[in-house]
Amino acid sequence: MDDTLATDVAPTALPPAPGADRYRSLDFADTAATLPAGQSYDLLAAPESAMRWLAAHDLTTPDVQLYEVCAQRMRTLRAHIRTLFAARVDTTAPPQESLHAVNEALTAVPTAPLLAWDGARGLRRIQAHPTDQAVNHALATLAADAADLLTGPDADILAACGSAPCDRFLLRTHGRRHWCSTRCGDRARAARAYARRSGASD
């Protein structure tokens, strides 16, 4: 299951969707999308761009090198998270495959600092994630974040952008908000105005 798109071109003048600052999994889900103008982008299309996204979200350090297999695992988890988000928005039962994938990521590594004993410093918390497990740790963190969103109070305001063909997700931080950006909102309003004018002239 993979929603990889053909390009890693970043969207221009398109801010993060509402709620992306509170849930990294929401921003993660929106790393691949189709914009209102029909342009597609995928910020995880290549290992280099996937690494930049992880580093920008404090999910790894810049010295970690990503390979295509790691980027593919990120894209696969993203596809499953998007499927779970869509099921929540549509109030349908989520596929067991996607639940299993998120649960597998959740339990792959501990996401919290572990308690360890150091003879010189005593008890302390440590992140027991060697470099080769950096992606496992990032995916576990994103899976936990998605689970928190889907089971918490904000699940009720999770929505899909209402300006087709844009398929980004957002939190409806305002009751009547149905778009992921001003750009999408303006386009939807313009389309409605055009439809009204066309109907009046028939």
Where are these regions (language model features)?
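Short helix-coil boundary/hinge micro-motifs
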Residues: 1-160, 168-169, 201-202
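Alpha-helical elements of the RecA-like P-loop NTPase motor core of helicases
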Residues: 27, 188-191
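Short, hydrophobic-biased amphipathic alpha-helical segments
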Residues: 142, 186-189
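Short, cysteine/histidine-rich loop/knuckle motifs that typically chelate Zn2+
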Residues: 160-165, 182-183
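Cys/His-rich microdomains that often coordinate metals
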Residues: 165-170, 188
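Cysteine-rich micro-motifs
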Residues: 175-187
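Contiguous alpha-helical segments
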Residues: 192-202
